[in-house]
Amino acid sequence: MSEAVRVPSPATPLVVAAPAPEERKGKESEREKLPPIVSAGAGATAGLDRGAKGQISTFSSFISAVSPKKEAAENRSSPAHLVFPNIKNVREPPPICLDVRQKQRTSMDASSSEMKAPVLPEPILPIQPKTVKDFQEDVEKVKSSGDWKAVHDFYLTTFDSFPELNAAFKKDATASFNTIEDSGINAKFVNAVYDTLLNTPQDVQKTVLKGIINSLLREWKGPRTKDDLRAYFILLQNPQFNNTSTYVIYAHLLRQIATLVEADHHFLVHWFKKLSQKRFKQLVERLLQFISLRLFPAKPEEFPPITKCSWWIPSAAKVLALLNTANNLVHPPLIPYTDFYNSTLDHIDLMEEYHTWQNFGNSHRFSFCQYPFVISVAAKKIIIQRDSEQQMINIARQSLVDKVSRRQRPDMNILFLNMKVRRTHLVSDSLDELTRKRADLKKKLKVTFVGEAGLDMGGLTKEWFLLLIRQIFHPDYGMFTYHKDSHCHWFSSFKCDNYSEFRLVGILMGLAVYNSITLDIRFPPCCYKKLLSPPIIPSDQNIPVGICNVTVDDLCQIMPELAHGLSELLSHEGNVEEDFYSTFQVFQEEFGIIKSYNLKPGGDKISVTNQNRKEYVQLYTDFLLNKSIYKQFAAFYYGFHSVCASNALMLLRPEEVEILVCGSPDLDMHALQRSTQYDGYAKTDLTIKYFWDVVLGFPLDLQKKLLHFTTGSDRVPVGGMADLNFKISKNETSTNCLPVAHTCFNQLCLPPYKSKKDLKQKLIIGISNSEGFGLE
């Protein structure tokens, strides 16, 4: 390992705030007891031990689920049709299932194509009864004749067994289709049959459900063939499972899929990723709905007692994990990762879920924390904050006990992280204070500016963050380079003797998360991926931190021009060696001096050719994003994790860490209007009406400037606009004056302008020229 990528020794200031080796070792041994955060490649049975696996005790109730007394329920609008709102503004790890939690997650791509599982001989299938065209013609005939017999007979035969399902929907009944890339299913035919099903008479729909019951009973035991997997794949898409009256059947289908072996899950995952976006999203929404209505049933009497079906939710969560992994294997994903959030979970006891997960070694109980992709970022923030609060309370309690045991008078200041800094020496004072008080980093933060009166009720803390961030990220400071093309900062590769200020930035980000402060920082997504590599500080100091697999796409988020050039090199159809005349040596300017670096031993003598260009691009990208800034980023990493040393970080995706630190880029000005408070104005006053007419009509860039002008950031906290506590105050000055913002209190002081035109003009001038005016 070269010097550039060596982990700093324990004697360096980088790890001064990290836990002691003995403490880390103890914590690491505790974390080994945690259940793995489930990926589709993992075992299928997590949490399924709540219910009996050897028998299907509730299948006897299947028939009652489709009996005539349920017809009214099937016809009316069911709670199962509600659509859960996605938490917007918010790729596990890709962030969750692919590469961020290396110890907990398994990429499906890492598995071999056949998983080395024995391929069972496929049974001889019945003769395929109809084609898509035949089925559609039968449906058309019904419109004129009203006779459903042909359609009824088709559904009766098709859903009677797994072989019949394959006979109906397999592209070629004689072909095996034992590959992960092609399920062999005629998707168009499946979609046509299911789209028609909900418009058929009730007796046809009951016939299908009874056929599924028979199929599941018949196929409950024994090894699975690929035809069995195809049948599960087809049945899972049945839209009848939107109705709560079918949930008993649906639950047993989910359990059979969840308990398949890993090799079978591997096939299903790759088949799922071939679904259309519409059908894929329907599967996800149906499963989320199933979990929500099992947790909070509109009519509890529709379901078996929870004690007899405690395996329902674990089974659904496991199948969701398969879909989540499939989604992460597609670039871009079929649906946004936020579509997997289940907002219903925001209303359960999240800390109980978290503690169950933490204590898994003792209880082996199911916890949603094993499936963090269904937990919204807002819910994860609650878990992190409450976990940190508990840590703060424990530290403060120990401090009080120590004081009392020494017969010293307790000082309430020991409950806080008290920062005393001079404005003229902001960075050095802050660094000194945080270094001296590294044991107090998890306490509530309070800031005092030396020589200034006033209590910190939140405003001074926010001002300290804003001033410090602006100073550290200023180009003249030299720690970070601002890339105009990508509008983001990246770590300077300049070598120095002390990287403690990078540790300070990491601590600031950690404190911001724990103290609910939104920072005006612009790092690329790659930064947060590195920050979770690994999500917990390793006990072995020799293990590199902040190193992750990077691609040209990651580089494009920082240096788009260079990334474009490397992409052209990869796609060049001519002779790369003659046309580009490059070697495995790169150059960087440091303080006006050009320095050369070999990407591999003897790189200056190795030409880039058509054969090795992929290696060159990978090494160059890795050099820029990992090796050349290793010491800087390691200091930053240790700083962040010295504050955020919590297992809760294992629940987060890189994008979610960014949202916790910087807020969401998606604005909802109507929500801001609803939550705004007024001082000196009423929301019915003419000036206020003018203000909102103007602001709601602003283009997005001006709305962001307004938010930045009034709050110090153009992003929204995790809790939404309401968490800003935005206030408009009446400024009793001349209407010739511009609006004034008290950034630390998210307050806008607005003169009583007499016309909308005047207000718009003054507001645009104010928000467009606020840089350099300083904080008020």
UniProtKB/Swiss-Prot annotation:
InterPro entries: E3A/B/C-like (IPR044611), HECT_dom (IPR000569), Hect_E3_ubiquitin_ligase (IPR035983). The active site is at C744. Gene3D superfamilies: Hect, E3 ligase catalytic domain, Hect, E3 ligase catalytic domains. The keyword Transferase applies. SUPFAM superfamilies: Hect, E3 ligase catalytic domain. Residues 21-34 have a biased composition (Basic and acidic residues). Residues 1-46 are annotated as: Disordered. Its EC number is 2.3.2.26. The modification Phosphoserine is found at S9. E3 ubiquitin-protein ligase which accepts ubiquitin from an E2 ubiquitin-conjugating enzyme in the form of a thioester and then directly transfers the ubiquitin to targeted substrates. This is Probable E3 ubiquitin-protein ligase HECTD2. It comes from Homo sapiens (Human). The gene is HECTD2.
